[in-house]
UniProtKB/Swiss-Prot annotation:
Its EC number is 1.11.1.-. PROSITE patterns: PEROXIDASE_1 (PS00435), PEROXIDASE_2 (PS00436), PEROXIDASE_4 (PS50873). This is Putative heme-binding peroxidase. The active site is at residues 74, 214. Binds 1 heme b (iron(II)-protoporphyrin IX) group per subunit. Gene3D superfamilies: 1.10.520.10, Peroxidase, domain 2. GO terms for biological process: cellular response to oxidative stress; hydrogen peroxide catabolic process; response to reactive oxygen species. Keywords: Heme, Iron, Metal-binding, Oxidoreductase, Peroxidase. The lineage of its organism: Eukaryota, Fungi, Dikarya, Ascomycota, Saccharomycotina.
Amino acid sequence: MNYPSVSEQKHRVFIIYSAYLRVQFRESARLAVSVRNKNYNLVRADLHNILPQKNTTVFKDGTLAPLLIRLAWHSCATYDKYTRTGGSNGATMRYHLEASDEGNVGLEVARLSLEPIKRKHPWITYADLWILAGVVSIEACKGPSIKWRDGRVDYEDDLLVPPNGRLPLGGGDASHVRTIFSRMGFNDQETVALIGAHSLGRLHHHRSGFDGPWTSNPAKCDNEFYKLLLGNVWTLVDSPTGRKQYVNSTGQVMMPSDMSLIEDANFRFWVDQYAVSEELWRDHFALAFEKLTELGR
């Protein structure tokens, strides 16, 4: 058998490597042009386009918005002000350690839904895209406009993934809620305002263990969550998975952590305020959510 000479082998390697460099150069040039031409308004438009969902078996309320808000929320809520770790930077939920946190079950659907937009606009980081998706979703559900700025980076490995257990748990009491939110840097007023996002979406037993909608219109961002907390008789029942949850006569549900907002005097003060004034809640929620998106930067 005749083997190629050393010079022939080198020539073949050179040809292959040259072809590889040409491909890399074209890709780098494409990305460079893309970055120069980056347009967040186009990304926003594409995000709006993916929100309506015809498959009401999977998306009972006909929209992807609540799930994208949850993705944005949870990607920020790992922040620890004491160690200055976690938060919206890094898009660390791409890695198994964070993706496997019990609080993030089901969010792979949200992440995968954003992949076509990421491929279309490769210049935007995952970290920025996830947060922008949440902001756009709030606005699409008639919620307040949220100030948003870019500049988040994607971590190249999982070395800076925050530990599991930092997300709020639905079965927690007022002490748990206050501990989790104060660790992120929120006071009681901001905490209650942020939890008002439970006006959107619904609980799924295969994700959280709880089941049912919080409000009568899970696709509308308003202050109904607070009104329902105060204006209903809530009965403690078992969810399909055996977790304790509260239900009213019309089928809305609350988790123990939700009910803690009217059991704790300091939290209750703000529930009362927001139930009366949607405008006040919208103003406070917009500021608190903006603060949430900036954690860890």
